[in-house]
Regions:
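Residues that line or immediately flank small-molecule/substrate-binding pockets and catalytic motifs
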Residues: 46, 74, 110, 146, ...
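Glycine-rich, proline-tolerant flexible connector loops at the mouths of alpha/beta enzymes
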Residues: 73-93, 147-152
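Short secondary-structure transition/capping segments
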Residues: 81-85, 116-119, 154-156, 195-197, ...
Length: 295
C-alpha cells in the first residue's frame, strides 16, 4: 500500500474540506421549501371536486397529490353525517388517523339569518349536534355561514347582524365544550361584505368563533383586500380558495398577508368537478406553492 506523506495530506486538505462543505450544503438544500412544514398547507373541500368520492377515495387521492387535509362538506358521497353511529364514527376517525390526510373541518350549511324563530332554532341546535360529530371524529372545527340580510322582509341590517352574532355566541360556546372551533365562512348576500361580516364577528361574544376566509370578489371592495384582511386577521383559522388561475384575485398578496400573521393552517381548494381530478389537484398544489415561492 502506498503511503501518503504529511506534505501530500496537507496539500489535499482544502479540497477535502471543500468537498465536505459542498456535500453539507447539498444536504441542507435537499429539504425543499414545499416540504419544510412552514407556511400554509394545501387541502381540499369536497365541494365540488370530491363530491362523489367516499372516504377511502378521498384519502387515497389526497395522499397521491400531497394534499394535507380535507373539509368534508355535508350531503356528499363520503356519508359523514350526524346519522352515523358511534361505531361508524370511530371507523371514520381511524381511517384518517391512520393516513397522512388530516380531517381538518366539517362543512355545514347552518346559517342564522332567518326571521322565522323555528328555523333559527333548528340551525342552532343542528350546529351543536354537528360539533359533537366533529369531536367524535377527531376534527377540530366546523364551518358555518351567515347567509343573507333580510331587508326585503322589513328587517334592518343591524337586526340581522345582531341575530347572527348572538346565534354564533350560542353555538361557539356549545362547540367549545366539545373542543371544536366554529369557523364562519365569509359568505352570502350582503353578509359577504366586510362592513357587515366584521360587525358580526365583533358583536359575537364567544372567543371560540373564528373566520373562514373565502377568497370572494367582495374581499376587494369596501377598502380593498389589505384593509379587509386586517379587520379580521387575528381571527382567521381556516381558508377556502377557488381556482388559482383567476387572475383578478391578488393571490400573491393574500399569501403575503397570511405569512404576515404567521398563518400555517389549511387553505382548502373549493373548485369544480373534473374528469381528471388528480391532474387538476397536482397542478393546483404547484400553483399554490409557486405563488409563495416555495417550489
Amino acid at each position: 500500500m502506498k503511503s501518503i506523506t504529511r506534505r501530500q495530506l496537507l496539500k489535499s486538505a482544502p479540497a477535502v474540506i471543500g468537498a465536505l462543505s459542498v456535500a453539507e450544503l447539498a444536504a441542507a438544500q435537499a429539504v425543499s421549501p414545499a416540504d419544510s412544514g412552514k407556511g400554509p398547507k394545501v387541502g381540499l373541500v369536497t365541494y365540488m371536486l370530491a363530491a362523489e368520492w367516499d372516504v377511502p377515495t378521498i384519502i387515497a387521492n389526497c395522499t397521491e397529490t400531497k394534499f394535507a387535509a380535507v373539509e368534508l362538506r355535508t350531503t356528499h358521497a363520503h356519508g359523514v353525517e350526524v346519522s352515523l353511529s358511534q361505531v361508524q364514527r370511530a371507523e371514520v376517525r381511524k381511517k384518517f388517523e391512520d393516513s397522512p390526510v388530516k380531517l381538518a373541518s366539517l362543512g355545514s350549511a347552518f346559517e342564522y339569518d332567518s326571521p322565522d324563530p323555528a328555523v333559527l332554532k333548528q340551525n342552532i341546535e343542528g350546529t351543536k349536534e354537528y360539533a359533537r360529530l366533529a369531536a367524535d371524529l377527531g376534527c377540530d372545527g366546523i364551518k358555518v355561514r351567515p347567509n343573507n340580510l333580510q331587508e326585503k322582509q322589513g328587517i334592518t341590517k343591524q337586526q340581522t347582524i345582531t341575530q347572527i352574532a348572538d346565534s354564533l355566541t350560542i353555538v361557539g360556546r356549545a362547540a367549545a365544550g366539545e373542543g371544536v372551533e366554529v369557523r364562519v365562512e365569509v359568505h352570502g348576500g350582503g353578509t359577504n361584505r366586510f362592513p357587515v361580516y366584521s360587525a358580526i364577528m365583533e358583536q359575537c361574544q364567544s372567543p371560540n368563533v373564528y373566520v373562514c376566509w373565502n377568497c370572494n370578489d367582495s374581499d376587494l371592495e369596501d377598502g380593498g383586500l389589505e384593509h379587509n384582511f386586517k379587520l379580521v386577521a387575528d381571527k382567521i383559522h381556516f381558508v377556502h380558495m377557488r381556482d388559482l388561475f383567476v387572475e383578478e384575485y391578488p393571490w400573491r398578496k393574500l399569501f403575503e398577508l397570511l405569512a404576515g400573521t404567521g398563518y400555517e393552517g389549511y387553505c382548502c381548494a373549493e373548485i369544480p368537478a373534473s374528469s381528471d381530478p388528480l391532474r387538476v389537484m397536482k397542478y393546483y398544489r404547484a400553483l399554490f406553492l409557486a405563488y409563495q415561492n416555495r417550489l
